[in-house]
């Protein structure tokens, strides 16, 4: 004789006492309020959804983390998806790359705290070091008030001035790797000595001397603007001390 399966029962309706208990149990939950972002660009080149309000960010939620863990997306697509869920008052596609990195650092900071632990293998003695970094201490270089976009760039070899627009999240497909980036440099140049014809621009950019190409790439890369992710690494096992990029691994958006 088979025993009938018990049907799952729904939780009973909450009472006022239940609500009080739940509120007490969650008393120490971190704030999920939106935090105003002081972007390196100072919002200077953006058309905000509501010009009377700032750009804000909220901490990641458990739901966000579940989506991240189950997502088949990786790299920039996954990071953009996270930012799209947490950033308010701006169309994500127009966010400058120099602001995106700042946003990612702040998203990690407001979600898990200002400290970030990473395991670094010493290039000298090969020992693993457990290092704690303080994300809130990373210096930020803000743009000058007089800066414009597109940015005028003087090419030292050609002795000509061009204007180049700063890359945004929408441009990431043109910057996947160095080969693709070099082939698409012309897309970011809006003017060469007053000439705006894209055919002329494309032909000139293809023939740029290396020094001039590097001058162009330097500006596109932010030229020192934005959050500085260079940190000092001091090995605990040997005398090595060196500057390095903040080691951002797959666990950056976890509670490490």
Model-predicted segments: where are they?
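Long C-terminal interaction/binding lobes of large macromolecular proteins
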Residues: 1-256
């Amino acid at each position: 004789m088979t025993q009938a399966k018990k049907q799952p029962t729904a939780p009973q309706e909450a009472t006022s006492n239940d609500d009080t208990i739940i509120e007490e149990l969650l008393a120490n939950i971190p704030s999920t309020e939106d935090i105003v972002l002081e972007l390196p660009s100072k919002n200077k080149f953006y058309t905000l959804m509501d010009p009377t309000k700032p750009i804000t960010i909220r901490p990641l939620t458990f739901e966000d983390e579940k989506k991240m863990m189950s997502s088949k997306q990786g790299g920039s697509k996954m990071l953009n998806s996270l930012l799209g869920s947490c950033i308010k008052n701006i169309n994500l596609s127009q966010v400058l790359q120099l602001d995106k990195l700042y946003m990612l650092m702040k998203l990690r900071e407001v979600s898990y705290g200002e400290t970030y632990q990473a395991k670094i293998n010493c290039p000298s003695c090969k020992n693993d070091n457990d290092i704690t970094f303080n994300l809130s201490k990373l210096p930020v270089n803000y743009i000058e008030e007089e800066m414009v976009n597109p940015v005028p760039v003087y090419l030292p070899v050609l002795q000509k001035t061009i204007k180049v627009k700063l890359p945004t999240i929408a441009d990431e497909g043109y910057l996947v790797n160095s080969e693709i980036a070099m082939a698409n440099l012309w897309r970011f140049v809006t003017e060469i000595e007053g000439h705006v014809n894209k055919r002329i621009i494309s032909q000139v950019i293809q023939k740029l001397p290396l020094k001039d190409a590097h001058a162009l790439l330097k500006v596109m890369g932010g030229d020192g603007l934005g959050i500085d992710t260079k940190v000092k690494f001091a090995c605990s096992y040997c005398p090595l001390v060196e500057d390095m990029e903040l080691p951002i691994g797959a666990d950056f958006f976890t509670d490490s």
